[in-house]
């Protein structure tokens, strides 16, 4: 039976490809998609969810727009990475359907209530919507199987020296998620920076030759440009968000450790840092499954295989 999931995202090139991967995978049942501000403004990320679902002919999936700003901070966006639209590069269709007349939290709560089995939440943007759900609906915690997030890092940040972008945008929300008592799976930069898509991988996707694989290749063409900066030392573009979906589909591609994770919300230099107790120094019980490595070729092969679904 397919695993029910709720996808909360802020498209974003890698979020868009995570949607493509999830909807090409019969092992997953995407119950709803909610949007958050992050990679672009809330209006643009919502529009990008609708555009992607229009492209994929999945306008049956309920969509709702989430929080317009973090819990306690002003919004930061990553338009320098994702462009003016949030999905610059390919020509995407205009949305042919409208979002639900409710908030992201209301749609999430409704989806959890109506599900006969616990639902996995996959969150590939800032954790604002998920934190609001957890705080406003404690009675639904038991309906959440796990929360799989793209965010954080054991080591170096990508937005500040200490912090990864998604966590930095709303560290208070991320701390609520990690300390919720619900199982958390963390795909941080330690693994996503190894999940790089090289130019030859993009050409492999393009050669599959269907409209969706072509769009994915064009998204990657644009996404690669930002990551060519020598400071990163990358061969390709790190495909952060699809690691969450890939872990659900093929956990054997990933190396994980069980550790306690906390989020720094006060630090002078370290706000938004995910503090991973790798050496068990705090005495805190592990609260997260932390991805630390990936079989890059296996990850690329999975993407290529699933893109054929759209023929």
UniProtKB/Swiss-Prot annotation:
InterPro entries: I/U_nuclsd_hydro_CS, Inosine/uridine_hydrolase_dom, IUNH, Pyrim_hydro_RihA, Ribo_hydro-like. One of its GO terms (molecular function) is purine nucleosidase activity. Pfam families: IU_nuc_hydro. Its EC number is 3.2.-.-. GO terms for cellular component: cytosol. Keywords: Glycosidase, Hydrolase. The keyword Membrane does not apply. One of its GO terms (biological process) is nucleobase-containing small molecule interconversion. The active site is at residue 240. HAMAP family: Pyrim_hydro_RihA (MF_01431). Hydrolyzes with equal efficiency cytidine or uridine to ribose and cytosine or uracil, respectively. Belongs to the IUNH family. RihA subfamily. This is Pyrimidine-specific ribonucleoside hydrolase RihA. It comes from Escherichia coli O1:K1 / APEC.
């Amino acid at each position: 039976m397919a695993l029910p999931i709720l996808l909360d995202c802020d498209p974003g090139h890698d979020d868009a490809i995570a949607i493509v991967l999830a909807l090409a995978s019969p092992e997953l049942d995407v119950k709803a998609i909610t949007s958050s501000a992050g990679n672009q403004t809330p209006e643009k990320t919502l529009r990008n969810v609708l555009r992607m679902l229009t492209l994929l002919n999945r306008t049956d999936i309920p969509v709702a727009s989430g929080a317009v700003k973090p819990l306690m901070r002003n919004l930061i966006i990553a338009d320098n990475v994702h462009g003016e639209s949030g999905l610059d590069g390919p020509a995407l269709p205009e949305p042919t359907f409208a979002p639900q007349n409710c908030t992201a939290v209301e749609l999430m709560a409704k989806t959890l209530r109506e599900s006969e089995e616990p639902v996995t939440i996959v969150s590939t943007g800032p954790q604002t919507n998920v934190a609001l759900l957890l705080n406003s609906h404690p009675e639904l915690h038991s309906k959440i199987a796990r929360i799989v997030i793209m965010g954080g890092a054991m080591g170096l940040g990508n937005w500040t020296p200490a912090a990864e972008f998604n966590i930095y945008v709303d560290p208070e929300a991320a701390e609520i998620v990690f300390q919720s008592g619900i199982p958390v799976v963390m795909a941080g930069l330690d693994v996503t920076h190894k999940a790089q898509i090289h130019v030859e991988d993009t050409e492999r996707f393009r050669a599959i030759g269907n409209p969706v694989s072509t769009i994915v290749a064009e998204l990657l063409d644009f996404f690669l440009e930002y990551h060519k900066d020598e400071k990163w030392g990358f061969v390709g573009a790190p495909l952060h968000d699809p690691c969450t979906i890939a872990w659900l589909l093929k956990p054997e591609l990933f190396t994980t450790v069980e550790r306690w994770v906390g989020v720094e919300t006060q630090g002078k230099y370290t706000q938004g840092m995910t503090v991973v107790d790798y050496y068990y120094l705090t005495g805190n019980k592990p609260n997260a499954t932390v991805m630390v490595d990936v079989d890059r070729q296996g990850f690329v092969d999975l993407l290529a295989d699933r893109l054929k679904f759209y023929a």
